[in-house]
Each structure stands twice: as structure tokens, then as C-alpha cells.
């Protein structure tokens, strides 16, 4: 192919001429150091290229060579437990080759070419196969059984397939198609900007159980759903994302650190290998893929890292796995779009963001979902996309937050005031919402308890009434309230502090199963039922609220381990006995 030459360099944007043979979104190599870039605009023979590496020292006249193929990722065994940069270069391999810093023009294969994987066939000679069918499996980690699928566009009859140890570039199967014999390797490539195909999309119904009480009870996200976590600085977005990555009951986690601090990725690398998955007992790292594109890495690669992450997630979804994708933060990605748009001299939209911000965000979130995968067995897979948004100054009316809210169905609004009061997770229960409540409510009623929806509705009503009553208290004081209204304030305080507050760094409180959440919520609300019974019998509210030891036990129920959940029921029994005793002693006197 003809080689072009650079005529202008503007930060990560390079303009080259003599590129008439290239196509938009082609991958190109720029300069003597062969920096990786991607064509984002074509005008005649001039191409605008966003370069994914530092362009310092690059000048006019430098050669530009097109590869003739789009930016693609390598998909195969070796993805799990790996850490990549925004364009899927393995950071560990780069560190061994070049030290602590990314060297310009360094070329490293995404997947290890030397490691051998044991391949076990699932089909045999002369079987008919088509795109998406599982040819065999590779046990990648103790948790993940990596399924090797027929690549898209191939259909025919298996000629050869053998069990054995192979590298990702070895041919494991030959398929006779109408276009000749096609060789299938353990690895396949896929362009990042193109969604992987599936048979049909399904309606998400089952919840992604996160172990975080405010999320699972009040604002659940379905497996295959999309959620946004907007919040100002210091409100706990990253900790919420880490908690979901640690405890969410997805089988695979893809964590994208997009333009955030390097320390946060270091935390993930240090914590995840030590943490045990409550379902498998194995390290959480054994089901995790990390994509680190920290704030000091080239801006253009931020734009690619979101697509790299979702393509890897789609690959595991196609195997029939439930995948959780965390993007922290989509605001940094939008800022990268804004910078490139400005350098391209495009007409700016709101706050300088490009006019196509909404459609780019939609392209990303719409690749989430629950689907029937390609292949004969009609297996189901799901991607749950959870994006953090960092609005400047916590202003939720800014363009990235508003564009995101138009697309996602779950909104967990983090509140700086709650964070300053040390209430974590700082999700504001009054302005957050989930549009999956009805379908997940039916699932909860069937699988956890028939009372689930009623208890949740009651608790939410109490919290909303508390907000109204606080307005009255501020105006005329608490003495103006009736005893039953003052009781509501006490119960609301108990819901907030004993149920919704959760310590991410406590061994027990960091994760609550659905059964434990149900028992805890029932216990908190049974305090209201029993207290109202006592009020009707003539007991003064002060007598009920002064049952300090019992209320302390209710507050400490969150620290009861999962295997000792029967103790929560015992506290409920004790509560009934104490109220009966109180009615016997006080009720008659005051009646």
C-alpha cells in the first residue's frame, strides 16, 4: 500500500496526505517509531489520525503506513487475570520489556504466544458446525472454562480436530466450508467498534446480586441492564464500582479504569487477588479482566479503551456467561472525545462536547443486554454495563450525565452531603431510581420471599415520609409531631443507619446475601409494627425508644455472619417479648 506523509501534528491528532488508499477507522503506523493510530476522518487524500501514543518529536514529513484493517482485539485464552492498556497491550509484558513507563512504538502481542493451553474438543470429525457453535474448551483458570467458538462467517463440516496442548496461534480445527477449508485457532480477532452478533435480544429479569443492600433492595439492576453512578468528587464512585466488581454475582468481570488515578488501579491489583468469591471460594482475580488507561496515559487511547472493554465482554457473553462491565469513568472518556473534536475543529455542542456525544454513549450502552447467543445450543449470555460519571462540581444537569440518563434504566445518584456525614454507600434514596423494579420484584417474590416487594415499598415510603416530616420539624420543632410520626422518624433513622449504611472495609458487612437482606429489613420494620402495637396499648414513645440494648442488637444485625443468620430471627423474637413485657408494665397504667 502507498505510504503517506505527515503534514500537521496537533497533540494526539496527526494529519497526513497521500492516504487515498486508506479507509476510515483503518489502523495506521505513524513515523519512524511506528506509533499506533486510527483514521477518524478522511477528506480527499488527507486523513486525520488519532494517535494512541505520545506524539512528542513527531514532525511533518514523517511516513504514515496503513495496515488496511480496523483497530481490533485478540480474543482467546489468556484474557482472564490480564491487565491491558486502552488498545489491549499487556502492561505486564511491556513492564518486562521496557520498565515502568510505556515506551513509544513498543510492540507486544496482546495474548501470550508461548503459553500452551490444553484444548478438549466438544465436536468430532464430520460434525456440521456454524458460527457460534462450541468446538471445545480450555480450562483457563479454576473458575473460567474458556469456550472456543466457531468464528463468525464460518459454516461447514469438521475435517480435523484433536485434543492436545496448543498455543493461541496453533490451528485446533479445520472446517470444510463452501469457500474452501477454514482453519480455526484458539484465538480470533474482532474490530472493537463493531458489536459482536447474537441470535436475539431478551428482556432482562433476574437481578445482578451485588451484596450492597441499598442497591439490591431499593435500586436493583438486572443482569443485562445498564446503570449509571454519577456523583461529585469524594462521594465514593470508585468504591461502589470496586464493590460491584468484587461481589456482583456475574461470572466474568471486565473493569475499565478510564482516565482515573493510577492509584485506583493499583488498589484493584493489590486487593482483588486476595479477596475470595463467596460462591466459588477462589480469588476474584480468576474471573477478572482489567483495562487500565490512567489519567497520565495518552488521551486518545481513552476513547478506545471503552470499546476494547465492551468487545472483550461481548466475547465472554457469547460463551454463555453473565458479564459485569465497570467503566470508571465515562466522563473522562467524554473529555477525550471533546479534546479530539476540538482539534478536528468540529462545531461544539453543550459545554464544548461534540454534538455526537449522545449517540456515542448510546453505542456503548446498547451493546449491553441479555441475549440468546449464536450456536445450536441457544445458550444465554448477558452484559451488565455500569458506568461511573464524574460531573464537575456534582452538577447532574451537565451533558454527559444527561445523555447517560436518557439511555440507562438505573440511576444511583451519589450525594456529597451523605458522604460528608460518613453515610456510605452515599446513594441518595430520594433521587435514585431503577426501572427494573417490577420485573425484579416478581423474581424476588418467587426466589427470596413473597413479602419482598411489600417490605421494600414500606421502607421506601417511610424514607419519603421522613423527608416530609423533617421539613415540618425544621419549621415548628419535633414537639409538634404526633407520637406515631415521631416513631416514623425513629424507624427511618433505623433504616438509614442500620440497613442502608454499609461498611465496604468490614469483613462481614461488605457483603449481604439476599436472604440476610430480607431478614434484616423485616427485623427493622418489625420494630415499627411492635412499637405501634405498644403505642396503641398506651405505652409512651420515650419508653419504647429507651430500649437501648435491644435497639443496639437491631443495629448490630448487619455484623452477624451469613452462617449465623438464625440470630437475626432470635432478635425479632426478643423484640416481641420485650414489647409484650412493656405493654404489661406500662400499657395498663397509661390506658
Curated annotation (Swiss-Prot):
PROSITE patterns: ATPASE_ALPHA_BETA. One of its GO terms (molecular function) is ATP binding. It catalyses: ATP + H2O + 4 H(+)(in) = ADP + phosphate + 5 H(+)(out). Gene3D superfamilies: 2.40.30.20, 2.40.50.100, Bovine Mitochondrial F1-atpase, Atp Synthase Beta Chain, Chain D, domain 3, P-loop containing nucleotide triphosphate hydrolases. Transmembrane segments: none annotated. One of its GO terms (cellular component) is proton-transporting ATP synthase complex. It is an enzyme of class 7 (translocase). InterPro entries: ATP-synt_VA_C (IPR055190), ATP-synth_a_Xtn (IPR031686), ATP_synth_asu-like_sf (IPR023366), ATPase_a/bsu_AS (IPR020003), ATPase_F1/V1/A1_a/bsu_N (IPR004100), ATPase_F1/V1/A1_a/bsu_N_sf (IPR036121), ATPase_F1/V1/A1_a/bsu_nucl-bd (IPR000194), ATPase_F1/V1_b/a_C (IPR024034). The keyword Ligase does not apply. Keywords: ATP synthesis, ATP-binding, Hydrogen ion transport, Ion transport, Nucleotide-binding, Translocase, Transport. One of its GO terms (biological process) is proton motive force-driven plasma membrane ATP synthesis. Its EC number is 7.1.2.2. It comes from the Bacteria. ATP binds at residues 231-238. Belongs to the ATPase alpha/beta chains family. PANTHER family: H(+)-TRANSPORTING TWO-SECTOR ATPASE, V-TYPE PROTON ATPASE CATALYTIC SUBUNIT A. Produces ATP from ADP in the presence of a proton gradient across the membrane. The V-type alpha chain is a catalytic subunit. This is V-type ATP synthase alpha chain. It comes from Clostridium novyi (strain NT).
Amino acid at each position: 500500500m502507498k505510504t503517506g506523509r505527515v503534514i500537521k501534528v496537533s497533540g494526539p491528532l496527526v494529519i497526513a496526505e497521500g492516504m487515498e488508499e486508506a479507509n476510515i477507522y483503518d489502523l495506521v503506523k505513524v513515523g519512524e517509531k511506528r506509533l499506533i493510530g486510527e483514521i477518524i476522518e478522511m477528506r480527499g487524500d488527507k486523513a486525520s489520525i488519532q494517535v494512541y501514543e505520545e506524539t512528542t518529536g513527531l514532525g511533518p514529513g514523517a511516513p504514515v503506513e496503513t495496515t488496511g484493517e480496523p483497530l481490533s482485539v485478540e480474543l482467546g485464552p489468556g484474557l482472564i487475570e490480564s491487565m491491558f492498556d486502552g488498545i489491549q497491550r499487556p502492561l505486564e509484558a511491556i513492564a518486562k520489556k521496557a520498565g515502568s513507563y510505556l515506551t513509544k512504538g513498543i510492540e507486544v502481542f496482546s495474548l501470550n504466544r508461548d503459553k500452551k493451553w490444553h484444548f478438549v474438543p466438544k465436536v468430532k470429525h464430520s460434525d456440521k458446525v456454524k458460527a457460534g457453535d462450541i468446538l471445545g474448551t480450555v480450562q483457563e483458570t479454576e473458575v473460567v472454562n474458556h469456550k472456543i467458538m466457531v468464528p463468525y462467517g464460518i459454516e461447514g463440516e469438521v475435517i480435523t480436530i484433536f485434543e492436545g496442548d496448543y498455543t493461541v496461534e496453533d490451528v485446533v480445527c479445520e472446517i470444510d466450508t463452501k469457500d474452501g477449508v477454514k482453519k480455526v485457532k484458539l484465538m480470533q480477532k474482532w474490530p472493537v467498534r463493531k458489536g459482536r452478533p447474537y441470535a436475539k435480544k431478551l428482556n432482562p429479569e433476574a437481578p445482578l446480586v451485588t451484596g450492597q443492600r441499598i442497591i439490591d433492595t431499593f435500586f436493583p439492576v438486572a443482569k443485562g441492564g445498564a446503570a449509571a453512578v454519577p456523583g461529585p468528587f469524594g462521594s465514593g464512585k470508585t468504591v461502589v464500582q470496586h464493590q460491584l466488581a468484587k461481589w456482583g454475582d456475574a461470572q466474568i468481570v471486565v473493569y475499565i479504569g478510564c482516565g482515573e488515578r493510577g492509584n485506583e488501579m493499583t488498589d484493584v491489583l493489590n486487593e482483588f487477588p486476595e479477596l475470595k468469591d463467596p460462591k466459588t471460594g477462589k480469588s476474584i482475580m480468576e474471573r477478572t479482566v482489567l483495562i487500565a488507561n490512567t489519567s497520565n496515559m495518552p488521551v486518545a487511547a481513552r476513547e478506545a479503551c471503552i470499546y476494547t472493554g465492551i468487545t472483550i465482554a461481548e466475547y465472554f457473553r457469547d460463551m454463555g456467561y453473565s458479564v459485569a462491565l465497570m467503566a470508571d469513568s465515562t466522563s473522562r472518556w467524554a473529555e477525550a472525545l471533546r479534546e479530539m473534536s476540538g482539534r478536528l475543529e468540529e462545531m461544539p455542542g453543550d459545554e464544548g462536547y461534540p454534538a455526537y456525544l449522545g449517540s456515542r454513549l448510546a453505542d456503548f450502552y446498547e451493546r449491553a443486554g441479555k441475549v440468546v447467543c449464536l450456536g445450536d445450543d441457544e445458550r444465554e449470555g448477558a452484559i451488565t454495563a455500569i458506568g461511573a460519571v464524574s460531573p464537575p462540581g456534582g452538577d447532574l444537569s451537565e451533558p454527559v450525565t444527561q445523555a447517560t440518563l436518557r439511555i440507562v434504566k438505573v440511576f444511583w445518584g451519589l450525594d456529597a452531603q451523605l458522604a460528608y456525614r460518613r453515610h456510605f454507600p452515599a446513594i441518595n434514596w430520594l433521587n435514585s431510581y431503577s426501572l427494573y423494579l417490577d420485573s425484579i420484584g416478581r423474581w424476588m417474590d418467587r426466589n427470596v420471599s413473597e413479602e419482598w416487594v411489600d417490605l421494600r415499598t414500606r421502607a421506601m415510603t417511610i424514607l419519603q415520609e421522613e423527608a416530609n416530616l423533617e421539613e415540618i420539624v425544621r419549621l415548628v420543632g419535633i414537639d409538634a409531631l404526633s407520637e406515631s410520626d415521631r416513631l416514623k422518624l425513629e424507624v427511618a433513622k433505623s433504616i438509614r443507619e442500620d440497613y442502608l449504611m454499609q461498611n465496604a472495609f468490614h469483613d462481614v458487612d461488605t457483603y449481604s446475601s439476599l436472604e440476610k437482606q430480607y431478614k434484616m429489613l423485616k427485623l427493622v420494620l418489625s420494630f415499627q409494627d411492635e412499637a405501634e402495637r405498644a403505642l396503641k396499648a398506651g405505652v409512651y414513645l420515650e419508653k419504647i425508644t429507651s430500649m437501648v440494648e435491644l435497639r443496639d442488637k437491631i443495629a448490630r444485625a448487619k455484623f452477624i455472619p451469613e452462617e449465623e443468620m438464625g440470630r437475626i430471627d432470635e432478635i425479632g423474637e426478643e423484640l416481641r417479648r420485650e414489647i409484650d413485657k412493656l405493654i404489661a408494665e406500662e400499657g395498663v397504667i397509661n390506658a
